[in-house]
Each structure stands twice: as structure tokens, then as C-alpha cells.
């Protein structure tokens, strides 16, 4: 199978953040090109890694790429959305783990494979499904969702300030004929954005494409579900490393980690906080870890990456 061409972002930092024990049990929730998985596996002796991906392409590639570890019995692939983490691990007899890693960037091959429809740079059928077996696609969102639903996702998931004129333009065009390709959609989005605004702030379709992709794959819902399960799966001293690439995901992770590591509301004047009220988790880094200048120089996709790490302390 052809190479995955996926440059892993914050590779050293995210795996170091897990404080790998050679005998531990670890989960890579986003296998992708296998960069993080390989780095974890290199440090395991009798430990084991469970690697999730809902994209069969990633699993097929890594069956070859990580064959040594597979043959040695150190690696199990799970073709599933990471929102099923607890169910899938329980079915395999795993109820506690030492570390869980999430890399929430769409893997480069999904962007680069024109026919998957993730990219506004290539003309392709409107698709954007991470899991090719699911029914909901970008075509259905663009052609069948109501004006109000489009408005909601462009605002909420794209933070697009021209959401209304863009949704109107889509509505107008699809009344004439279905919108079938990413190229058509890009041109329609441009119609909804004033010419002066199109000259600044990156590609005019970027925010709308992000919004549709998040809606098609229920990315924020899946992340929230998965993180809630992840904290209950961690053993004491276990850690979760999460790499985000956009503000919505980062805000969700930041809020959740803060809630897990904060004291409950207590009456004023308590001199000593009893142990049973102390939080079970602590933030390993209070501010997100960002890519180094060297990494930014070689990987332009790294510029928006942020790494947050949570540790279970009791």
C-alpha cells in the first residue's frame, strides 16, 4: 500500500507526556499514519498498545508499517470510533489503562486523497466521512439540511461571521441543481463573503469546510463522549495526552481537564481540605504545549496544534 505521508505533530512531546511504563497498557485513539503508535511501541517491553481508527485505510497501512509489533503480540488494532473506547476495551478484558493519546488533526492522507472531499484545494465529490460506511455525508448536509441547520453549524463549528449569506447562497444554488462537488461549494461560499473580506484571513472556504466536517463526523460529540470514558479508564499515575488543532476542540479539552482537576465548591474558611474532596486528577501543564520553531519550519500543518496533558493522581 502507498505511504501514508503523514507528518506526526508534537510527536516527542505527546508521547513523553504519557510517561510510558515499559510494562503498561496504552491506547492510541487516533492511529492515522502510526507515528505516535510507533513511538509508544518502541518503549514497551511486555506492555501492550490498543490503536483505534475508524478509517480502514489507516489500519491497512499500519498492518504493514507496524507489522513487527503486531507479530510480537504488542499491538491490537480496533476499527471503531474512539467514542466506543470503553466498550471496545471492555470486550477485550481491559478495564484500566496507563495512558491514552488523542491526535485530533485530520490525517494528511484524508486531506490529500482528493476523492475523500475533505479539502477545499481539490475538486472532489462532497463526502468528508471518516468512516466510509456511515450514511451521513457532506453531500447530505449541503443539499438536504435546512437553512437554519446550516446557519447553526457554520456559526457553532466554523465560527464563520458570514454564516447567513453563505447559507443563503447554498440554499439558492441547490434549488436550481444539487451541489455535488467541493469545487462547486467553494465557489458558492465565495459568493456569500464580501470581496474585501475574501482578501484576508486564509482560504474563504476554510471555516465552512471545517463546520461541515465536524457535523458529518460528530467530532465534538465523539470527543466529549470519549474523554468522559477515558478519565474513568485511567489507572493511578495514568495520563491522557490530547493534541488539538482548532479552538472548539481545545476549549472542550481545556474545560473538561479543568473540571477534573479542580476542587469542588467548598464553604469558606475550611482550614484543611479532606482527602476525599481533593481532585483525582492534576494538570501536567497549565498552559498548552506548542510546537517548536523547528517543527513549524518543517510542518506547516503544526502551527495551530496545542497539547494538553492530564494525570490521575489518586
From Swiss-Prot:
Organism the protein comes from: Levilactobacillus brevis (strain ATCC 367 / BCRC 12310 / CIP 105137 / JCM 1170 / LMG 11437 / NCIMB 947 / NCTC 947) (Lactobacillus brevis)
Molecular function, one GO term: rRNA (cytosine-N4-)-methyltransferase activity
Upper classification of the organism: Bacteria, Bacillati, Bacillota, Bacilli, Lactobacillales
Gene3D superfamilies: Putative methyltransferase TM0872, insert domain, Vaccinia Virus protein VP39
Annotated localization: Cytoplasm
Gene Ontology CC: one annotated term: cytoplasm
GO biological process: rRNA base methylation
UniProt cross-references to InterPro entries, sorted A to Z: RsmH, SAM-dep_MeTrfase_MraW_recog, SAM-dependent_MTases_sf
Recorded family membership: Belongs to the methyltransferase superfamily. RsmH family.
Protein name as it appears in the record: Ribosomal RNA small subunit methyltransferase H
Amino acid at each position: 500500500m502507498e505511504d501514508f505521508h503523514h507528518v506526526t505533530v508534537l510527536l516527542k512531546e505527546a508521547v513523553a507526556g504519557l510517561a510510558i511504563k515499559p510494562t503498561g497498557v496504552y491506547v492510541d485513539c487516533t492511529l492515522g499514519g502510526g507515528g505516535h503508535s510507533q513511538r509508544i511501541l518502541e518503549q514497551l517491553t511486555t506492555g501492550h498498545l490498543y490503536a483505534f481508527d475508524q478509517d480502514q485505510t489507516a489500519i491497512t497501512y499500519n498492518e504493514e508499517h507496524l507489522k513487527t509489533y503486531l507479530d510480537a503480540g504488542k499491538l491490537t488494532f480496533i476499527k471503531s470510533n474512539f467514542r466506543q473506547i470503553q466498550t471496545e476495551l471492555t470486550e477485550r478484558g481491559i478495564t484500566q489503562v496507563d495512558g491514552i493519546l488523542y491526535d485530533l488533526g485530520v490525517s494528511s492522507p484524508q486531506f490529500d486523497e482528493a476523492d475523500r472531499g475533505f479539502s477545499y484545494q481539490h475538486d472532489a465529490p462532497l463526502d468528508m466521512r471518516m468512516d466510509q460506511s456511515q450514511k451521513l455525508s457532506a453531500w447530505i448536509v449541503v443539499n438536504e439540511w435546512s437553512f437554519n441547520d446550516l446557519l447553526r453549524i457554520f456559526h457553532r463549528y466554523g465560527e464563520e461571521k458570514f454564516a447567513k449569506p453563505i447559507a443563503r447562497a447554498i440554499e439558492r444554488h441547490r434549488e436550481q441543481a444539487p451541489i455535488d462537488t467541493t469545487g462547486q461549494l467553494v465557489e458558492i461560499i465565495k459568493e456569500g463573503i464580501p470581496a474585501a473580506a475574501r482578501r484576508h484571513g486564509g482560504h474563504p472556504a476554510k471555516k465552512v469546510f471545517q463546520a461541515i466536517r465536524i457535523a458529518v463526523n460528530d467530532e465534538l460529540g465523539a470527543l466529549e463522549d470519549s474523554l468522559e470514558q477515558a478519565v474513568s479508564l485511567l489507572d493511578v499515575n495514568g495520563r491522557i495526552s490530547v493534541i488539538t488543532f482548532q479552538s472548539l476542540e481545545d476549549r472542550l479539552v481545556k474545560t473538561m481537564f479543568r473540571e477534573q482537576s479542580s476542587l469542588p465548591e467548598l464553604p469558606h474558611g475550611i482550614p484543611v481540605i479532606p482527602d476525599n474532596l481533593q481532585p483525582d486528577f492534576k494538570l501536567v501543564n497549565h498552559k498548552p504545549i506548542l510546537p517548536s520553531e523547528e517543527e513549524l519550519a518543517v510542518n506547516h500543518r503544526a502551527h495551530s496544534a496545542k497539547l494538553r496533558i492530564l494525570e490521575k493522581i489518586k
